[in-house]
Amino acid sequence: MQIQSHYKKGTLLFVLAIAVTLIAAIGTEPLYTDPYQLEYPDYFGNRISIPKNNPTTKQGVYLGRMLFYETKLSSNKRISCGSCHQQKLAFTDGKAFSPGINNVPTKRNSMSLANLLWVRNFFWDGRAKGLEEQAIIPINDPHEMGAYLDKAIKELQQTKVYPTLFRKAFGTAKITSDRIAKAIAQFERTLISANSSYDNYLKGKYTPSEEELNGMELFMNSAEASKNTRGASCAHCHGTPKMYMELFHNNGLDSIPKDRGREALTGLPNDKGRFRVVTLRNIALTAPYMHDGRFKNLEEVLNHYNEHIRPSKSLSLFLQGQSNESGGKNLGLTAKEKSNIISFLKMLTDTTFINNPAFSNPHLVRSK
């Protein structure tokens, strides 16, 4: 009996210790009980960006998805992150400039959110150093969502659904701007696009057409007339399987740019007109193009790089002296070559990405 009594007492103390530990953890730290499995091909590499204090969990991702499409996070209750980043358009919106609060247009074109897991500098000028920072900036921006976060948080706290979701994701029902940013960032890290015809080609499951193969070769090759090699020199900035490199370039849009680009952030003259290199995945879906949406279609983009590069002191070295013709003053691609390149670019469309129900608006599902 004495042994049994000590056993029960020891068990009770152990259970109490565990309970106290759990209560303490629940009160101060997120509960990371259900990890979200991020799936992507090996050729994307493992140089991913996930902060230690914001691991990706199923609970956090679902909460982030709800918040991504939550119009309560805008001052007029009509705009969400999903307004400017629509799934059917590979998380862009088809406009040169997005209409923000009171239909005031934003200053730059909405960027695709595909494959942000590998990105370290966000926005066209790279001003945000992480997805958590990126997620909150548009919400606070007076010209975008224009939210008064303290007021929005009170509204979310008074709903039936959000306190429960925050408790599941972070251990308590308390809603904060930091937790909002973390949850949205978790959701955005799941927006992986890796099931295009190009991906299937890399896996040996798709045979490109002659036009697509020719376009791929031109895309990857540099224009070197001296070596009798024809190319479009795209791979300098877009040559990885993810179709971008984490670089900033002045791509010759203007000799004197109206938008200073990265220079406004760094103050460096060499950054004038430089913008972040964007992914070309799903590029056929994300018109109009460039930071100001000046090009309506891919044909206009190819024409720009082929014959309309504007010189400036900060012009990318990759765009200087490139020509397929000996002594040529421009790239010198033929109409057929440009058409072939566009055929290749269309291989980068991932229809499963734009139709994945895990990325869709959950509020529409809940309202049915």
Predicted regions span which residues?
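Short glycine/threonine-rich turn/loop motifs
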Residues: E29-I137, D199-H304, I309-L317, N356-K368
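Compositionally biased, intrinsically disordered low-complexity regions
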Residues: L12, T21, A96, N102, ...
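Extracellular low-complexity, Gly/Ser/Thr-rich intrinsically disordered linkers
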Residues: R294-T352
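Amphipathic, soluble alpha/beta structural segments
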Residues: E155-T176, L253-K258, R262, R310-L331
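Post-cleavage N-terminal segment of exported redox proteins
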Residues: Q2-V61, V119, I137-N140, G146-E224, ...
